[in-house]
Amino acid sequence: MARISGVDIPDNKRGEVSLTYIYGIGRNSAQSILTKAGVNWDKKVSEWNDDEANAVRAIIASEHKTEGALKSEVQLSIKRLMDIGCYRGLRHRKGLPVRGQRTKNNCRTRKGKRKTVANKKKATK
């Protein structure tokens, strides 16, 4: 397995797909990285020679924010929204959907597991 940006990328897959295992790199950026490095997209990672792997590593290190640096930047921007008290920050703080989705029926992913309320026994007449 090749190791790029602290992530083991699979050898048996095409380079374009393998690079998407790195947080912060999708299909489009993987294609542009491979084009700049002069590596064919369809070439499997196991077929890369050392020069190609080093070229890909250098491009990712110089031009892209990945893994820990990107995650910390995202966390800092969310924290900034919460600190300034804007609507998006309040939604993050409350654990509700941020982008205007309805919350009456759905949004279970964001709210978490249902919190059931105990039924009161019906008063007997």
Swiss-Prot record:
Disulfide bonds: none annotated. It comes from the Bacteria. The keyword Metal-binding does not apply. SUPFAM superfamilies: S13-like H2TH domain. GO terms for molecular function: rRNA binding; structural constituent of ribosome; tRNA binding. The keyword Ribosomal protein applies. One of its GO terms (biological process) is translation. GO terms for cellular component: cytosol; small ribosomal subunit. Keywords: Ribonucleoprotein, Ribosomal protein, RNA-binding, rRNA-binding, tRNA-binding. Residues 95-125 are annotated as: Disordered. InterPro entries: Rbsml_uS13_C (IPR027437), Ribosomal_uS13 (IPR001892), Ribosomal_uS13-like_H2TH (IPR010979), Ribosomal_uS13_bac-type (IPR019980), Ribosomal_uS13_CS (IPR018269). HAMAP family: Ribosomal_uS13. PANTHER family: 30S RIBOSOMAL PROTEIN S13/40S RIBOSOMAL PROTEIN S18, SMALL RIBOSOMAL SUBUNIT PROTEIN US13M. Located at the top of the head of the 30S subunit, it contacts several helices of the 16S rRNA. In the 70S ribosome it contacts the 23S rRNA (bridge B1a) and protein L5 of the 50S subunit (bridge B1b), connecting the 2 subunits; these bridges are implicated in subunit movement. Contacts the tRNAs in the A and P-sites. Belongs to the universal ribosomal protein uS13 family. Part of the 30S ribosomal subunit. Forms a loose heterodimer with protein S19. Forms two bridges to the 50S subunit in the 70S ribosome. This is Small ribosomal subunit protein uS13. It comes from Cytophaga hutchinsonii (strain ATCC 33406 / DSM 1761 / CIP 103989 / NBRC 15051 / NCIMB 9469 / D465). The lineage of its organism: Bacteria, Pseudomonadati, Bacteroidota, Cytophagia, Cytophagales. The gene is rpsM.
